[in-house]
């Protein structure tokens, strides 16, 4: 493993010493310049969610909404309660309310979406407080463990490592294990976003998408008894 990184009991790789970056207008300008792609991603992600659940959620919270393309797609589709939470109060589409971090964790949500977000949040313990029926996530796909002896060399040059910005790195097993420890069951994992996001000549997998659900408390109690 590279210097300044460690692996936890779930297999998640964490940067140890961090110099925080600023998530400001200049940072957001990169994504605004990719507006055509981000709009497509917003609708692609919503279609993925609706295809799994077979229903329109009653409430959606997007943590780290950025340019707001996903939460706007949810609002247009007919989600009654749409909310966004971000480190900076970026503009939100009409009809979408802003909630701060405490409000986000205090609320109860049909769906919480975190696309390209989990890897940025310093303290992942908030997952234990998240009250969501469903959870949709996209993170960079870390192949360090998969590549074995070649993992360090790959990790050192991986364009998505982004020290001080991407603080945690996940593969399929570690993402599932982390969320299971916080009460979320994996429904499906895939790499569908690579169809839009891979650069010319680049080979995947590059983005790992996961959909999770939190079982009803009665179901959890029955499973624990079994």
Predicted regions span which residues?
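Conserved beta-strand signature within the Rossmann-like core of class I S-adenosyl-L-methionine
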Residues: 133-144
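Conserved N-terminal segment of class I S-adenosyl-L-methionine
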Residues: 1-115, 124-130, 146, 151-162, ...
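Histidine-centered active-site/metal-ligand motif
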Residues: 120, 166-169
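Conserved acetyl-CoA-binding loop of GNAT-fold acetyltransferases
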Residues: 184
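Short glycine-rich, flexible loops that bind phosphorylated cofactors or substrates
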Residues: 120-121, 144
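Residues lining the SAM
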Residues: 115-118, 138
């Amino acid at each position: 493993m590279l210097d300044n990184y460690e692996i936890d009991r779930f297999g998640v790789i964490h940067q140890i010493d961090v110099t925080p970056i600023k998530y400001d207008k200049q940072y957001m300008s990169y994504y605004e310049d990719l507006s055509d792609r981000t709009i497509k991603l917003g609708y692609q992600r919503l279609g993925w969610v609706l295809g799994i659940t077979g229903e329109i959620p009653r409430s959606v919270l997007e943590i780290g909404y950025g340019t707001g393309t996903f939460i706007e797609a949810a609002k247009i589709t007919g989600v009654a309660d749409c909310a966004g939470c971000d480190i900076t109060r970026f503009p939100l589409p009409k009809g979408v309310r802003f909630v701060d971090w405490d409000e986000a964790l205090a609320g109860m949500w049909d769906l919480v979406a975190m696309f390209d977000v989990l890897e940025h949040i310093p303290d992942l313990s908030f997952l234990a407080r998240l009250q969501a029926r469903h959870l949709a996530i996209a993170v960079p796909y870390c192949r360090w463990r998969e590549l074995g002896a070649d993992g360090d060399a790959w990790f050192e040059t991986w364009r998505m490592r982004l020290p001080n910005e991407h603080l945690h790195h996940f593969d399929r097993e570690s993402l599932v294990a982390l969320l299971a420890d916080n009460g979320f069951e994996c429904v499906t994992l895939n790499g569908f976003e690579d169809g839009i996001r891979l650069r010319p000549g680049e080979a995947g997998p590059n983005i790992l998408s996961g959909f999770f659900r939190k079982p009803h408390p009665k179901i959890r109690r029955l499973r624990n008894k079994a």
